[in-house]
Design a protein with these regions (language model features):
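Short gly/ser/thr-rich secondary-structure transition/capping motifs
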Residues: 18-27, 79-85, 185
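Structural alpha-helical scaffold elements that stabilize or flank donor/cofactor-binding regions
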Residues: 32-33, 92-93, 125
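Conserved N-terminal subdomain of the carbohydrate kinase-like
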Residues: 1-44
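Conserved phosphate-binding/catalytic region of the ribokinase-like
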Residues: 60, 114-214
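Glycine-rich, flexible loop/turn motifs
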Residues: 10-11, 20, 69, 75-76, ...
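Acidic, amphipathic alpha-helical patches
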Residues: 29-30, 90, 120, 160
């Protein structure tokens, strides 16, 4: 269930036990995925302890085929009764990814306080040739790896609807642009990397201008 707080930002009440989208095995998931898959994306409500035995084998197999792995942390309070186990599960998924999106709010929900860049560096240290997209709300976003730190200011929407789906819109648009430019790796042309970050920011601004996720 989705609500809005006094600032118009979305708030959620989650019911995540015995739900259909978690009723899948690693084998079943691998069987239905396209053979020509370039990227596998997951995150948020799927990053729970009970999904480790499903998704980690899937991710491991896909990486062996050269498929890129994308994770959107998109942490939510109340997803898992044991919050510490939820945090630990997220860390295990992040370590498997080629690219991760995390927000300043995600860091707070997962008990990571202080300088966001410090926590991003810890994520990068756990990843193999990984990249992290850090979003900071009104302060813009960063695309970070051991080789670069590209900053992007937000684009102000001419009108304001709400922020529902803004992060999803931002990251999906950015990932799509990286794939179009064959730039989903650290050594890619930084102009292409920066353009993808800009493209995602523009898409988010369009979403924020309307009510609901677009």
């Amino acid at each position: 269930l989705v609500y809005k707080d006094e600032q118009g930002n979305p708030d959620y009440r989650l019911y995540r036990k015995a739900v259909a989208d978690l009723d899948v095995s690693a084998g079943k998931l691998l069987n239905i995925l396209p053979k020509d898959l370039e990227l596998f994306h997951t995150g948020s409500l799927a990053l729970v302890p009970e999904m480790l035995d499903v998704l980690i084998p899937v991710i491991t197999e896909l990486k062996s085929r050269g498929v890129k792995i994308s994770i959107d942390v998109n942490a939510r309070k109340g997803v898992e009764v044991n919050h510490q186990k939820y945090i630990e599960a997220i860390a295990k998924f992040v370590a498997c990814a080629d690219i991760v999106k995390v927000s300043d709010e995600d860091l707070l929900i997962t008990n990571l306080y202080g300088d966001p860049n410090t926590h991003v560096q810890s994520m990068l240290n756990s990843m193999e040739n990984g990249m992290v997209v850090l979003t900071l709300g009104e302060a813009g976003s960063h695309f970070i790896s051991p080789k670069f730190n590209i900053q992007q200011d937000i684009y102000k929407a001419k009108s304001y609807g709400d922020t529902v789906g803004a992060g999803d819109t931002f990251f999906s648009a950015m990932i799509a642009q990286l794939l179009r430019d064959d730039a989903l790796y650290q050594e890619a042309d930084q102009e292409k990397l920066g353009y993808a970050l800009k493209f995602g920011s523009l898409a988010a601004a369009i979403n924020v201008a309307k009510v609901g996720c677009h």
